């Protein structure tokens, strides 16, 4: 049973643990669908009869914890209370991190269906736009962080908010260095392309039109038959773009030993070493990213940006063994992950990777979005 006391206790314990082991780091908090009681619920501020305040205890708790741990000041705390647990912060000069409560577009949040024709009843996306405009005006780069992904197979979010987000990301793509989401417990990504909306009829998913991308990170929690995992990003300190990342995992078959030794984290793969060879698509005339390759390989000086990941989907089309490898890494080398070795699976995976809105994802072939066994 998930109660308010349990949520508060969990948040306090987790934040204290982070602060203990990384006392000089600024932790960025992004609330997910299990960070409320009941789960999956976030109420927008325009509800009548006090209904909008039923989750205010959660925002108040997070605001107090962020301040007490030294990760924000009074201004940060007020933003958290105002924006449903979301806030913006500048941990380094030239970088603005914007945390969103993505339960506002979560398909399982019952309040998402009130005023459903309005893409932003909570005004969260308006606030995001204001933050991105301020970042643009101040020549800052922005990271967007959240829990529920806006796209992939279309099963987690609703259409109107993620269509509006698509337009916002397209407008501010030069300001947004990267976006980071989770929720699925799996290793995935998706790309935004130039578009005024996330509707399938308006998006030309061509690599030369790639504008932004989102890392959908795997989880430490194994959930259903995937191995625990954690990721270390290697970031350019001036542009705040990701140059590489290292993915670590631990095998669950060692679980009985963990109470004596703790988990042993092994390197599973590095993104650049694994995915930066585009020689086959270049040879076949299908490489169209605006970056000149070096002997068929993505230059070491170039970031792993939207063009990189869009070009990777083109390379996967001509080298489907890369899709199979991505499928293996999606479950972090889990023996329980199903193979992706059919034309139907290949086409579905490529479609998901090119779908950064719910609408786009739902127009992809269904049934191949997850590697977990439920």
Where are the model-predicted features located?
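Core catalytic region of metal-dependent phosphoesterases/phosphodiesterases
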Residues: 1-53
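Short, glycine/acidic-rich beta->alpha junctions
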Residues: 6-12, 81, 157-161, 225
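Histidine/cysteine- and/or acidic
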Residues: 13-30, 161-180, 185, 197-221
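Short, electropositive alpha-helical surface patch
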Residues: 14-15, 41-59, 155-169, 197-201
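Structural recognition of the beta-strand scaffold that forms the well-ordered cores
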Residues: 26-31, 35-38, 88-90, 96-100, ...
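Active-site environment of divalent metal-dependent phosphoester hydrolases
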Residues: 29-40, 106-108, 148-155, 159, ...
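Metal-dependent phosphoesterase/phosphodiesterase active-site architecture
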Residues: 50-96, 101-109, 113-134, 138, ...
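Active-site-proximal segments of metal-dependent phosphoesterases and phosphodiesterases across multiple
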Residues: 107-126, 133-181, 191
């Amino acid at each position: 049973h998930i109660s308010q006391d349990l949520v508060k206790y969990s948040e306090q314990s987790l934040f204290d643990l982070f602060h203990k082991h990384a006392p000089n780091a600024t932790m960025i908090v992004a609330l997910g669908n299990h960070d409320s009681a009941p789960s999956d619920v976030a109420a927008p501020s325009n509800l009548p009869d006090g209904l909008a305040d039923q989750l205010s205890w959660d925002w108040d708790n997070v605001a107090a914890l962020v301040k007490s741990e030294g990760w924000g000041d009074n201004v940060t705390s007020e933003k958290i209370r105002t924006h449903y647990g979301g806030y913006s912060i500048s941990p380094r000069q030239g970088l603005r991190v914007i945390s969103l409560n993505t339960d506002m577009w979560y398909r399982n949040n019952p309040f998402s269906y009130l005023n459903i024709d309005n893409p932003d009843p909570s005004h969260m996306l308006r606030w995001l736009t204001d933050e991105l405009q301020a970042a643009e005006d101040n020549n800052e780069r922005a990271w967007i962080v959240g829990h529920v992904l806006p796209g992939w197979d279309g099963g987690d979010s609703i259409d109107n908010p993620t269509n509006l987000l698509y337009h916002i990301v397209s407008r501010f793509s030069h300001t947004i260095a990267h976006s980071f989401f989770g929720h699925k417990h799996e290793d995935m990504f998706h790309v935004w392309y130039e578009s005024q909306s996330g509707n399938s009829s308006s998006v030309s998913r061509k690599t030369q039109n790639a504008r932004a991308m989102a890392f959908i990170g795997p989880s430490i929690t194994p959930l259903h038959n995937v191995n625990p995992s954690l990721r270390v990003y290697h970031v350019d300190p001036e542009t705040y773009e990701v140059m590489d990342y290292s993915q670590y995992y631990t095998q669950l078959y060692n679980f009985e030993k963990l109470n004596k030794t703790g988990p042993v984290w092994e390197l599973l793969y590095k993104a650049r070493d694994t995915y930066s060879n585009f020689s086959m698509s270049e040879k076949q005339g299908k490489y169209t990213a605006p970056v000149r390759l070096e002997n068929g390989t993505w230059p070491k000086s170039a970031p792993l940006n939207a063009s990189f990941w869009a070009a990777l989907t083109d390379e996967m089309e001509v080298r489907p063994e890369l899709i199979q490898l991505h499928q293996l890494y999606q479950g972090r080398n889990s023996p329980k992950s199903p193979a992706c070795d059919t034309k139907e699976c290949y086409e579905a995976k490529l479609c998901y990777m090119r779908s950064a809105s719910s609408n786009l994802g739902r127009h992809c072939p269904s049934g191949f979005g997850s590697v977990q066994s439920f």
